[in-house]
């Protein structure tokens, strides 16, 4: 996992040499990790650099069942990160949209249209400074 977090395109043979396994063993382990949902290998992009001019985190307060609201939010393609949480908000949802009009439309016409949504607070991203996915393993 550490080897692939450093470079998701690293050859299995190279990983095998670094960790003392054969290429076939590395391939099988990676396949098992992917199939079990432990790991994904994806290209991570900066949305602002690939045509999406607006990203924001939406804090959502809910009356009632937060998981039911999260189920409805999951279906929205603009939401790329969604967590049910404790604290000031019941749910945090990250959205990536083409522009401010699109962001406003998603918030007003879709998120706030969910009956259990009591209120929202929008945190518009101005600049992506750090984004990592290298938590390592235990």
Regions found by a protein language model. Give the residues of each.
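A compositional/biophysical signature of low hydrophobicity enriched in polar/charged and small residues
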Residues: 1-138
């Amino acid at each position: 996992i550490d080897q692939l977090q450093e470079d998701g395109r690293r050859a299995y043979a190279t990983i095998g040499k670094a960790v003392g396994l054969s290429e076939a063993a590395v391939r099988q382990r990676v396949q098992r990790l992917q199939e079990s949902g432990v790991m994904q290998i994806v290209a991570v992009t900066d949305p602002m650099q690939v045509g999406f001019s607006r990203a924001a985190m939406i804090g959502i307060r809910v009356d009632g069942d937060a998981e039911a609201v999260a189920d409805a939010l999951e279906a929205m393609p603009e939401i790329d990160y969604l967590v049910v949480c404790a604290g000031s908000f019941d749910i945090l949802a990250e959205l990536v949209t083409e522009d401010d009009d699109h962001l406003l439309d998603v918030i007003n016409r879709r998120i706030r249209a969910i009956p259990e949504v009591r209120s929202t607070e929008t945190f518009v991203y101005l600049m992506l400074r750090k984004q990592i996915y290298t938590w390592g393993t235990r």
